[in-house]
């Protein structure tokens, strides 16, 4: 099959033929329909998330079940599915406790580029090729069955592909924030996750929703999707602006940028006694200093949120799509053939895309 393979960090991806094995126990082979391109993939390409190459990335996958391994019961060949970027084992303590987004088994292998048994299902010329959270930049992908959710026949598979990360992470952020109807919320970062969060906040009954970013066209999109106010942090002091808009700061700040400046912005702008939810992922080795005294004296609650629960939250997201209360296609700014993936990567790196779909 064809796949976009990274051989060297910071070098273009290579489109080449690779071998894919049969799915093992609990695994599912998918014929890929579309895969969203996310900044987390770019972090792999740049070596900021150091998954060992050669590696095939791509973790917002939609497609058709081609084959199932022994013991698979949740899906069958022919099913239309989306894959979450989190692949829960379903058996560890966290999975059993309902926190499958924090699966202990998955956490041990997600940055190694292998399946839970320590091996990959891709190879070429007898050498293993690793995958990042599914390896969807290819014609086929193999993932654990617990990552998959069936998609109704009347729903466009391309439209829902980005639910696997952008949608699921936005949903998880709101669940962690425990917002009440009418609460004021600031969302820092208006990429795929931030814009998903804004749509889902509107669906959840949030009051004032403030979008913070640096690109006017993305802030305009945020207003279209449910933001009540926007702050361009390149043009004005964002912390001062957020506090002025909210009369002292929002009850909740959701940080979706994943860098030092935006994390500090979130901590500095939240209301005394408020909550900061961190969902943006910095590079895996990043260390960010914070003023702990301000957090303690302000009674600020800081919560880290990693994605959402595939088996619990993904069906709820699909229902919101069906009801017309969440439209993931509004995040998609481009559609590229697999052979054009390097062009899509460049656009995302330059801030000229939100989500691009890669079509094998």
Swiss-Prot record:
GO MF terms held by the record: oxidoreductase activity; zinc ion binding
Residues that bind NADP(+): 189-194, 218, 279-281, 355
EC number(s) stated in the UniProt entry for this protein: 1.2.1.76
Reactions accelerated catalytically: succinate semialdehyde + NADP(+) + CoA = succinyl-CoA + NADPH + H(+)
Cofactor note (record): Binds 2 Zn(2+) ions per subunit.
Keyword Oxidoreductase: yes
Residues that coordinate or bind Zn(2+) 2: 89, 92, 95, 103
Residue spans crossing the bilayer: none
SUPFAM superfamilies with a match to the protein in the record: GroES-like, NAD(P)-binding Rossmann-fold domains
Reported cofactor(s): Zn(2+)
Keywords (A to Z) from UniProt: Metal-binding, NADP, Oxidoreductase, Zinc
InterPro entries: ADH-like_C (IPR013149), ADH-like_N (IPR013154), ADH_Zn_CS (IPR002328), GroES-like_sf (IPR011032), NAD(P)-bd_dom_sf (IPR036291), PKS_ER (IPR020843)
Binding site for Zn(2+) 1: 38, 59, 165
Entry similarity comment: Belongs to the zinc-containing alcohol dehydrogenase family.
PANTHER family given in the database record: GROES-LIKE ZINC-BINDING ALCOHOL DEHYDROGENASE FAMILY PROTEIN, NAD-DEPENDENT ALCOHOL DEHYDROGENASE
Record function comment: Catalyzes the reduction of succinate semialdehyde to succinyl-CoA. The enzyme is specific for succinate semialdehyde and succinyl-CoA, and only shows low activity with palmitoyl-CoA. There is no activity with NAD(+) as cosubstrate. Participates in the 3-hydroxypropanoate/4-hydroxybutyrate cycle, an autotrophic CO(2) fixation pathway found in some thermoacidophilic archaea.
Listed name of the protein: Succinate-semialdehyde dehydrogenase (acetylating)
